[in-house]
Amino acid sequence: MRYRPLYNIALALLMIVGLAGCKREGGSGSDPNPPEPVPQMPTIKIPRGELRAVWMTTAWELDWPHGNYNPKVQRELYTDRLDLLRKYHFNAVFFQVRPMGDAFYDSKYEPWSKYITGQRGQDPGYDVLDFMIKEAHERGIEFHAWINPYRIETRPNNKKAFGPLHPSIPRGWVWDLEKIRMYNPALPEVRQRLLDIIDELLTKYPGIDGIHFDDYFYPEQSQGAFDDAADYKKYGSEYSTITDFRIDNVNKMVSSVSQMLRTKHPGVTFSISPGSNADHNLKDLYADTRHWCKNGWLDLIIPQLYQATNPTSQSGFYQRLSWFCQFSYKTPLAVGHAAYRVGEEGFSTNADEISKQIAIARKDSRVYGSIYYRLQDLVDNRGGILDRLSKEYPTVMPLPCFSRTTKAVSPVRDLSYKDGRLTWVTTGKTRSVIYFTSSVDQEAVVLDITEGSSLEVSRKGYYCVTALNEDNLQSKISEVLEL
């Protein structure tokens, strides 16, 4: 008991010291040596990734190979086209690999395309897709495999006979209409065949970045009448109308492709490019784009907005874009532009119209870029379109990330400068995007996208780097380096 007073005195002293410490930490100004403030690192705004793509049409040899059946000439033509796209900072090509119930590769389901050799079923003597995919990737260009899900053959009218049906395609799966031969969309066997074809394609060529459908579903009325009453009787008992039955046949196809891709090929982007008229899509082609987007079946929707920006027209570019932006829900959207209409009366005498459309699209955060129909019109610089795009696309740009399964990317570290070069350290299998701005008040531009970890630079200003994975997901920016 005799030590209690000393204990109380010690406790009181501790409380006084503690209160004094709290007072100093509260910032009363009583500390004669306050800690130095931590310097704020500069930060810069970087642009969002943007799709810059082109459709490369092989049906009727429109864009490739133009009647050139020599493998060496074909390869040179293709790489020349890729070099042009790289020069103008494109980052994706949508190449038509199945234009007419055929294949640009050795398939057990369908014959070699006649558009490679001039003869349906003839082996071209080289692996066309392997070459094309590798050459595109070497130039930093994604390769999306464009497939027509139902079309097998076309003809001008029924006075001309269709060719013999390939033995791999059962006769009972096919409609022969006035102007088109196509798979019957009502048949479960047809849906399964399409799944098998896509799975085979992606298994053979894992480097493919995307699967793409265009706007061909049920046939246009102008292509000929079809009779599916027997199919409706056999498969349609749960539907109140034959229209609902047809719409759901296409829905089932789109849904099953989406599910298969996400299960077996999760890194592959699934996109569809419907026509611009939503009523026509639904009532004539039985393509319910709203339903696809609302259910999240697509990674990207690319409406073909081939109209001019007429502010007074209810069917102009702006009005159609507004509709698709509203009813794409959470599905990313890109715009299909009519490069083939540049210089056409009622569209534009030059490429001004395309620039207007790009400007309108870029103002909407739901739009992630552009794709142009078609490649040959760019090659021909129709109406000066390439000259204009060189101003719209002054530097390279990474693509947006459309994948729903990709994991976060580790940022680059140790960004430094010495002897005229930036260097940095990456983690894992990634590319690097290098950004520059002369002022922190201005949005940065992309200097380069590289698999390396250094870049020669000379301009005074601010630099940062992001890591970019194979799904185009970018990391947070590195520290900002001022030179």
Explain the meaning of each model-derived region.
Residues 471-483:
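Extracellular fibronectin type III
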Residues 76-102:
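Catalytic domains of carbohydrate-active enzymes, especially glycoside hydrolases
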Residues 420-428:
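Conserved aromatic anchor
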Residues 299-313, 331-404:
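Substrate-binding cleft of secreted/luminal carbohydrate-active enzymes
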Residues 49, 57-76, 145, 150-200:
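Active-site-adjacent "subsite" loops/lids of carbohydrate-active enzymes
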Residues 90-91, 98, 139, 167-291, ...:
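Polysaccharide-binding and catalytic clefts of secreted carbohydrate-active enzymes
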Residues 457-474:
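Beta-strand-rich modules
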Residues 49-53, 90-100, 128-174, 212-214:
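Glycine-rich, aromatic-flanked loop segments that form ligand/cofactor-binding clefts
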